[in-house]
Structure formats: C-alpha cells, structure tokens
Curated annotation (Swiss-Prot):
Gene3D superfamilies: SepF-like protein. InterPro entries: Cell_div_SepF, Cell_div_SepF/SepF-rel, SepF-like_sf. GO terms for biological process: division septum assembly; FtsZ-dependent cytokinesis. This is Cell division protein SepF. One of its GO terms (cellular component) is cytoplasm. Cell division protein that is part of the divisome complex and is recruited early to the Z-ring. Probably stimulates Z-ring formation, perhaps through the cross-linking of FtsZ protofilaments. Its function overlaps with FtsA. Belongs to the SepF family. Homodimer. Interacts with FtsZ. The gene is sepF. It is found in: Cytoplasm. It comes from the Bacteria. Keywords: Cell cycle, Cell division, Cytoplasm, Septation.
Length: 148
C-alpha cells in the first residue's frame, strides 16, 4: 500500500508515469465498446405540427319532433359542431321550450345563436364564428347569389 501511495505522489509531481490497476479494466472495457447495445434509446424526435391543417367541419341539421331530442342537440354543440335546428313543424309551446333549453345551453357553452328564418336557428359553439346577419344576407342576395 505504501508503494502505491509513493507511486501516486511521484506521478502527481511528474517524476513517474502512474499505472493504476483500473487501467487493465479500462483496456478490457475498450474492447467491449463495439459490442455494447444501449438499454433504452432516448432519441428525441421533433414533433412537427402543421398549423394549416384543414379539418372538415360538419354542420348537423335537426328537425326535432319531441323534447327528448334536445340533449342530443346539445351533445353536438359540446362536441364543437354547429347545429341548424328547424322548429317550424312543432307546436309553439314545444318550440318555445326547445328554444329556451338550447339558448341556455348556448349561453353555458359560450356559443352563439342566430335566427335564419321563422323557426330556423343556427347554433354555433365558441369555436365557430357567425359573422353578419344571415337573415339580411338572404334577403339581399337570395339563397343562390349567382341567380340574381
């Protein structure tokens, strides 16, 4: 042990080349480097997200006949799908009940509702913007603007 200590001191001062027992192990390990396989590869791949993805939005059209269909309409709004609802062919009391229920749902979901015609409404979730007055657009341009 004292010989090892003296060898280390000589190496530290620079008088002697220090040989450690661990060098033998390192030489053996050098030969093994070629055969080493990593246990787990942690390659970080950059995820590329296209900002300009065009997702096709679907508009759901409902012509309800009973109030039991109201939760289904709200489910579509919760799934961020715009809904067109036609309340023309149901009783006025039921239509008012539908309108009040859907108006509350639109308010809770921070959406938008707009009247298109008598008894026909567009309900849009907060990710869909309804710009302009559709009723005025239909009066001015008609249903098919190219057929003026």
């Amino acid at each position: 042990m004292s010989a090892k200590f003296i060898d280390k001191v000589k190496y530290f001062i620079g008088l002697d080349a220090f040989e450690d027992d661990n060098e033998d192990m390192l030489e053996e390990a050098d030969g093994m480097d070629d055969e080493m396989i990593p246990i787990s590869s942690t390659s970080k791949k950059n995820k590329i997200l296209n900002i300009h993805t065009t997702t096709q939005m679907k508009v759901v059209i409902f012509e309800p006949s009973s109030f039991e269909e109201a939760p289904g309409i709200v489910d579509n709004l919760k799934n961020r799908k715009p809904v067109i609802i036609n309340l023309e062919n149901i009783e006025p009391d039921l239509a008012k009940k539908f309108f009040d229920f859907l108006n509350g749902a639109i308010y809770a979901l921070d959406g938008n509702i707009q009247k298109v015609a008598s008894g026909i409404f567009i309900l849009a979730p907060n990710n869909v913007d309804i710009s302009g007055n559709i009723k005025e657009e239909l009066k001015n341009k008609g249903v098919f603007p190219w057929q003026k």
